[in-house]
UniProtKB/Swiss-Prot annotation:
It comes from Psychromonas ingrahamii (strain DSM 17664 / CCUG 51855 / 37). Belongs to the acetylglutamate kinase family. ArgB subfamily. Keywords: Amino-acid biosynthesis, Arginine biosynthesis, ATP-binding, Cytoplasm, Kinase, Nucleotide-binding, Transferase. It comes from the Bacteria. It catalyses: N-acetyl-L-glutamate + ATP = N-acetyl-L-glutamyl 5-phosphate + ADP. This is Acetylglutamate kinase. The lineage of its organism: Bacteria, Pseudomonadati, Pseudomonadota, Gammaproteobacteria, Alteromonadales. The gene is argB. GO terms for biological process: arginine biosynthetic process via ornithine; L-arginine biosynthetic process. Substrate binds at G47, G48, R69, N161.
Length: 260
């Protein structure tokens, strides 16, 4: 596959699922882009906000360990329903409305990814690895838009919830895609609140130490740096500005490029 046609994987944060207009703008931008370009696209998504809502309605208290949701196996049907069901189909609905040939998938479909339990203390939380790219490559070749939830199935036949960032990295490795993290920020800001065009580990560590990068942005940056270690580089941009997304897809500099 040539560089011009290298797939782009868009990882969507769960917060965008609560913003109907942002979703419509996003998929409209993708539709505009694909009218003139043939670059294969994929989406991997989380859905923590919807999981929280479902568990709350079930009167289930949710706990986290080092930022990862503890998911007892008796809770995984609700979590899988929220992620592979509600979250995935909300995105599918917007994609289809925009005229995109979207296909809703999980990490398990077509044996795309293998998963093992991450930590017994976390319960039904898995870590995935690339396995078989045939299904995704076929869909991409035929012009479909895979929309992939972070639910996987282990060799033990049990359902697992995988961190969506890690799932996105794994799918990128599987199909040779570039990775774009879309969140609610334009990129990483410097001390003057200007977007940093390119960020490496050394600069990120300094800005975190100086508390220029902190709280939620620090979490995003650390995830991006981890992804860059495996993929070479990733992009951070905002779903709030769909016009910038079209520019980014066209190869223009938008947001922050995170490198090793």
């Amino acid at each position: 596959m040539t560089q011009a046609l290298k797939p782009l994987l868009i990882k969507l944060g769960g917060a965008v699922l609560e913003n109907e207009q942002a979703l419509e703008n996003l998929f409209s931008a993708l539709t505009v882009y694909l009218q003139t370009e043939q670059r294969p696209l994929l989406i991997v998504h989380g859905g923590g906000v919807i999981v929280e809502d479902v568990l709350k309605k079930m009167n289930i208290v949710s706990y986290k360990k080092e930022g990862l949701r503890i998911t007892p196996f008796e809770q995984i049907p609700y979590v899988a329903g929220a992620l592979a069901g509600t979250s995935n189909k909300l995105l599918m609905a917007k994609a289809l409305k925009a005229g995109l040939s979207a296909v809703g998938l999980s990490l398990a479909d077509g044996f795309s990814c293998k998963v093992t339990q991450l930590d017994p203390d976390l319960g039904a939380v898995g870590i995935c690895s690339p396995n078989n790219p045939a299904l995704l490559n076929t869909l991409l070749k035929e012009g479909y838009l895979p929309v992939i939830s972070s639910i996987a199935i282990g060799d033990d036949g049990r359902l697992y919830n995988v961190n969506a960032d890690q799932a996105a990295i794994t799918i990128c490795e599987l199909v040779g895609a570039e990775l774009l993290f879309l969140s609610d920020v334009d990129g990483v800001w410097d001390a003057h609140k200007q977007v940093i065009p390119e960020l490496n580990t050394q600069l990120a560590d300094r800005l975190i130490a100086e508390k220029v990068i902190q709280d939620g942005m620090a979490v995003k940056v650390k995830a991006a740096l981890q992804a860059a270690e495996q993929l070479g580089y990733v992009m951070l941009a905002s779903w709030k500005n769909p016009e910038n997304l079209v520019s980014l897809l066209a190869g223009q500099a938008v947001g922050t490029k995170v490198v090793k």
